[in-house]
Amino acid sequence: MITFLRRRLGSRLLAAGRRLLEGVQSPDEQYRDFNGRYFASLHEQERMLADQPRMEFYRAAIQRHIQPGDRVIDLGTGTGILAALAWRRGAAQVYAIDHSPILKHARTLAEANRIERVEFVATHSTAFFPAAPVDVILHEQMGDGLFDEAMVANISDLRDRVLKPGGLILP
C-alpha cells in the first residue's frame, strides 16, 4: 500500500513539476535573451560608439590587420560599425552576426551609407556556417560577463570551425 501511494504521489508530483517547468527558459536562454535586449538598446550602442579610444583602437587594428580581399566575421556586430570599417578596408566579404534586434538598425545604416559586401546574419555564432573559411574574426566579446555569456566558448567554437589556419582573431 505504501509503495502504491509513493508511486501515485510521486507521479503526480512529477507531472505537476513538469507543468511548472514548461516554458521556463534555461539559464543560458535567459541570459541570451537579456543580452540581446541589452545590446539592442540604441542608448548602449551610442555609448559604445562615443567611446573614442575604443573606436580608434578598432579602426587602427582593422587598418593594420585586415587585408584587401579578406573574408571577415564581425561577431556581435551591433550597429555594424566594425563590419563597415572592414568593408572600407577592402574585405571581399564581411559577415555581420548578431542575435539581437539591433541587426535591423545595422542593415539600415549600411544601406544608407552604401556599404556593400556585408551580409547581416541574425543568428547565434554557434549556428553560423559560412560558405568558406574566414581570414579574420572581429569581436568585442569582452567585459565582466566574459564567462557568463560563454564568450570564450563562442570565440573558440568559431575559431575551430570557420577560421583559416593562420587566421586572426581581433582583438
Predicted regions mapped to residue ranges:
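N-terminal auxiliary segments of SAM/dcSAM-dependent transferases
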Residues: 1-27
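Conserved SAM-binding motif I beta-strand of class I
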Residues: 93-98
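A short glycine-rich, Lys/Arg-flanked "PGG" loop and its adjoining helix->strand segment in the class I
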Residues: 152-165
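Conserved class I S-adenosyl-L-methionine
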Residues: 69-76
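Class I SAM-dependent transferase core
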Residues: 25-66
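S-adenosyl-L-methionine
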Residues: 107-131
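Conserved beta-strand signature within the Rossmann-like core of class I S-adenosyl-L-methionine
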Residues: 165-171
